[in-house]
Amino acid sequence: MFLNTLKAVFGTKNDREVKKYFKRVAQINALEGNYQNLSDDELKAEFAKFKEQILSGEKNENDVLNDVFAIVRETGKRTLNMRHFDVQLIGGMVLHDGKIAEMKTGEGKTLVATLPVVLNAMSGKGVHVVTVNDYLAKRDAEQMSAIYNFLGFSVGVVLSSQNSDIEHKQAYDCDITYGTNNEFGFDYLRDNMKFSKAEKVQREHNFVIVDEVDSILIDEARTPLIISGPTNRTLDGYIKANEVAKQMQKGEAVLPPAKPEGDFVVDEKNRNILITEAGIAKAEKLFGVENLYSLDNAILAHQLDQALKAHNLFEKDVHYVLRNNEVIIVDEFTGRLSEGRRFSEGLHQALEAKENVKIQEESQTLADITFQNYFRMYNKLAGMTGTAQTEATEFSQIYSLDVISIPTNIPIKRQDKDDLIYKTQNEKFKAVIEEIKKANAKGQPVLVGTASIERSEVFHNMLVKEKIPHHVLNAKNHEQEALIIQDAGKKGAVTIATNMAGRGVDIKIDDEIRALGGLYIIGTERHESRRIDNQLRGRAGRQGDPGISRFYLSLEDNLLRIFGGDRIKSIMDRLGIEEGESIESRIVTRAVENAQKKVESLHFESRKHLLEYDDVANEQRKTIYRYRNELLDENYDIRAKISQNIAEYSANVMNDYILDESGSNVNFENLKAKILYECSTQISEKDFENLSVIEMQDKLSQILENSYNEKMSRLEIKELRNIERILYLQVLDNAWREHLYQMDILKTGIGLRGYNQKDPLVEYKKESYNLFLELVNRIKFDSIKLLFSVQFNQEEVQNLENKANEENEKLLQSSVEMGASEDNLGEAEFKKVPRNAPCPCGSGKKFKECHGKSGPKQGILA
């Protein structure tokens, strides 16, 4: 109450921020008359003057903002016959300040972006504009290019349909580049697998505006971009695990100390499976093993866990569909099919076994990055969306982005009615159809939002029976989708769409539809996120148009059933609600919103938790990529680096074979054998007589230096440096891939440390640091071994770089390019663990000192 009083007197923080921006709008408006009186050439000359001041450092972007915004507004009027509204100027300033502009549907976000894009492109460092699909990227670039071209800027578009690096490089070399988040991210990963700077396509990460920022930075935050290659692991275990999973009985969860019945319990809130003691015994009998959680059977245990998830947490036509005997993921937020993406951790293989289709082989990560860490690389990050305030805390904590709600140009007239709640889904379905029939009878257009493809089909079949013409929108073709959505506001139109389909395309209505009350939005289920519901509502009431929105719910809906159904059911029982009747109450609507807040909080904590782990790997990634870029630089002294590595290698090897501190006792036989094997170099015991430990290390280093120089003496210096650089890069890349595999193993088993009263995150940081030190040493020493052992003829020398690139291309072509991450930090997966890796059992010891030496120990799958 006290806070509400303060807000009424002083306004909210958002109100105060907007008020500050309005003061600057007045200054921009005062310049409008000056620029509208100029000819085209004079206007261009004025802009060129400001651009020169930016490039020379005489002024910065903030100094010229008023004039540049006024010029862009005037350019929009002349080229597109579109004038930026005052509130759009505010949106532009918010984006330029590196914040998120929350602007309602129909407020012209595409036009708003031109203001900060032009202002920040003046430095010549490039501006990226990110959209959610190729159609929107192409459309926005084409629509706004008239403004950019008038002011002398080039515009490029990065599309998934473009197959060559040349096309991508041309797009990135433009002043302004439009594209999707996936393409920007994958190009970054591919660039860091190239063998020369000239082959890279991206420039520096200067300024980026992310359209539909909530979809990309929140909804997609747990989905890493992955470039991967095939492995040689057997897939038979998934078939066995699937057969066992089908024979296990589901039990009901109970509160401790009571023990659940059945073989396993489904934890729907956390989307996890808990196997009971009886279930473990049954699985061991069916598999024919004594201990399911021994080292030898741990992969089988993991495959069983994934099989149980596949059967109990993932529904066909909800979470995935079958197309041409392939399991294709359905994006939970858009309802679109996610071609090319696969669930990780063996879950996709489990789904393929469940559906009895060909099981695709597992893959090994070659390079990966999350959107969270990719977009945080930019010098300045900004975003636009119609719905961001509900996630303002996450934007602030994860991305350091403030959310500013921009006032609408014309007040919203849409009526948002309270939810109607029914006892069963069938009652709800019938009520929705009756409401559609009423609206359709008078010609009012209706947009029906569903939570899944399966639900879309239910309403489609019911409308067919009622002989009501309609469109079903859950296609994967964004362009076709956009055309259908554009017609959703026409008289008599009935459109069924998954909640987010067609996003980025406005639904326009005419005067006849306005007289009928505007577009009618019917939500058939509350999403776990209030933001998705608000996006559905926002399809109606654009630019001050009338409209109606209402959600129809049932106690059998997942959200109410899992997170809040008991309280609402008791209210309905007290009110004596009969079959077919509904309840409409602000109390119930608030209870539903509270359930959504619970889920949002769970998801936020999950994303935050994952980021804490990913930040560890991200720092290592940045270090390796930074060093890799140094190696690509022609001015980098690779020969000095090799000499340094030879010295470290020599010291390391000598220490392994010196048997006492004085250095008087050295195992020369084994030392000579090692140097001959690894460096193709003969050494004599006489060379080391009467030398101290340090002198022996230096002597070995000198011998190896001379041997290396002699070996490479027949090559031209330029050729030699190129060979050294490429071979060093190959060693680095191979070591990095192996390191990513080790990190995957570490992350998979780290949750078990909690059973030993240790913080898994702290343990993960310690172990990953040790792994990184091993990685650095492996790069140093393996490069030395390779350089000493490699033999070339002249043709191979000339084609070395081409061959390296061809091998990379093969890897990229075989890659599984998108990973849909399931959060399985608590599951130990004992694969073919390298001897020096941390043992997955969680002991903290190296594998060779634990299970690799002493044989299997009993473990628990968390």
From Swiss-Prot:
It is found in: Cell inner membrane; Cytoplasm. It is an enzyme of class 7 (translocase). GO terms for molecular function: ATP binding; metal ion binding; protein-exporting ATPase activity. ATP binds at Q88, G106, E107, G108, K109, T110, D506. It is a peripheral membrane protein. Its EC number is 7.4.2.8. Its cofactor is Zn(2+). The keyword Protein transport applies. It holds the Pfam family SEC-C. GO terms for biological process: intracellular protein transmembrane transport; protein import; protein targeting; protein transport by the Sec complex. Zn(2+) binds at C839, C841, C850, H851. GO terms for cellular component: cell envelope Sec protein transport complex; cytosol; plasma membrane. May bind 1 zinc ion per subunit. Monomer and homodimer. Part of the essential Sec protein translocation apparatus which comprises SecA, SecYEG and auxiliary proteins SecDF-YajC and YidC. Part of the Sec protein translocase complex. Interacts with the SecYEG preprotein conducting channel. Has a central role in coupling the hydrolysis of ATP to the transfer of proteins into and across the cell membrane, serving as an ATP-driven molecular motor driving the stepwise translocation of polypeptide chains across the membrane. Belongs to the SecA family. This is Protein translocase subunit SecA. The gene is secA.
